[in-house]
Amino acid sequence: MTNLRKTHPLMKIINHSFIDLPAPSNISAWWNFGSLLGVCLMIQILTGLFLAMHYTSDTLTAFSSVAHICRDVNYGWLIRNLHANGASMFFMCLFLHVGRGIYYGSYLYKETWNIGVILLLTVMATAFVGYVLPWGQMSFWGATVITNLLSAIPYIGTTLAEWIWGGFSVDKATLTRFFAFHFILPFIIAALVIVHLLFLHGTGSSNPSGINPDSDKIPFHPYFTIKDALGCMLLLLVLLSLALFSPDSLGDPDNFSPANPLSTPPHIKPEWYFLFAYAILRSIPNKLGGVLALLASILILLIIPFLHTANQRSMMFRPISQTLFWILTANLMTLTWIGGQPVEQPFIIIGQLASISYFMLIVIFMPFAGSFENYMLKPKW
């Protein structure tokens, strides 16, 4: 009798994706983040579903409905804390996943990489509209500041902003539609994840060495299922520690005050995972220029495959490129720090220098380093 998992139409897909999938034998823990992102997405969809059962998307009751969830709903406080901190874990895994892709040259699988960038943008959009829902001070003013950037677009900007708002400012209509967006987008993300995996399984995973691993592959199960299970347990340990011991450490204290359109918070800033992009936005003293730089800071990922000049795929044996990669990492951390600081000296100039170096590292220095390493590897005799 033939095995059901190899013959049944549905089981066959699962079998080829998670059981009999040939995987390179040398992929390190950096390849765990894909599965961890899948776990994060499932946690967010489940906790979000239970929150949506008790939340009301009305300006008069949104804030108190979140308080009601935390006070009166069975384990509502836990569901809310898991959802809020789950978003932070999601972005932490996303940034590490993208960083791994850049370091080991995974971006050369262009279709997988491009779908990944679209996924990143969709997750960022979902997190942004989700942050507006509790209708606290930072929710309201964050929504006002970021949606108002649309008005920088020539000719159609103001009309576009008012169309998104559903009125002349961020109000009841905005909150209702943001809740609708926040509910539907995770399912769009789930569909994109399937497409992402489809393209990935067409080529197979890359590996740390960057050379063709076809001669040495092992089945995904049990080797990588057990490895992913360990990663999953560590992720849950960190998430539960955050949610149970210091659930508000990554949030903004201003969001414990209900939204008040008549009082602006002293420092408007988004959640920590958007601070690097927010710092780039603020570093340009022109509205349209800032918006374009903000978009470019993420969309630049799309051109990375075309900037690859090295003969070797991975940075594993390329010390100059490695150095530049870690400088880029430090640069992004600097931008994250600057994004949370007030707009005054010396933070303004540090932010501007960090923004310029962010783009220069990716567009100029890293491609040049690849070419230089090719030259250094050529025999000189």
From Swiss-Prot:
Q: How is the cofactor bound?
A: Binds 2 heme b groups non-covalently.
Cited InterPro entries:
Cyt_b/b6_C (IPR005798), Cyt_b/b6_C_sf (IPR036150), Cyt_b/b6_N (IPR005797), Cytb/b6-like_sf (IPR027387), Cytochrome_b (IPR030689), Cytochrome_b_C_euk/bac (IPR048260), Cytochrome_b_N_euk/bac (IPR048259), Di-haem_cyt_TM (IPR016174)
Q: Where in the cell is it found?
A: Mitochondrion inner membrane
Q: Where mainly located?
A: mitochondrion
Query: Which CDD domains does the UniProt entry name for this protein?
Result: cytochrome_b_C (cd00290), Cytochrome_b_N (cd00284)
Question: Pfam family example for this protein?
Answer: Cytochrome_B
Binding-site positions, a ubiquinone: 201
Q: Where does heme b b562 bind?
A: 83, 182
Can you list the GO cellular component terms from the UniProt entry? mitochondrial inner membrane; respiratory chain complex III
Matching PROSITE patterns, A to Z? Answer: CYTB_CTER, CYTB_NTER
Q: Which cofactor does it need?
A: heme b
Q: What else is known?
A: Heme 1 (or BL or b562) is low-potential and absorbs at about 562 nm, and heme 2 (or BH or b566) is high-potential and absorbs at about 566 nm.
State the protein's purpose.
Component of the ubiquinol-cytochrome c reductase complex (complex III or cytochrome b-c1 complex) that is part of the mitochondrial respiratory chain. The b-c1 complex mediates electron transfer from ubiquinol to cytochrome c. Contributes to the generation of a proton gradient across the mitochondrial membrane that is then used for ATP synthesis.
Q: In its UniProt entry, what is this protein called?
A: Cytochrome b
Write the gene name.
Answer: MT-CYB
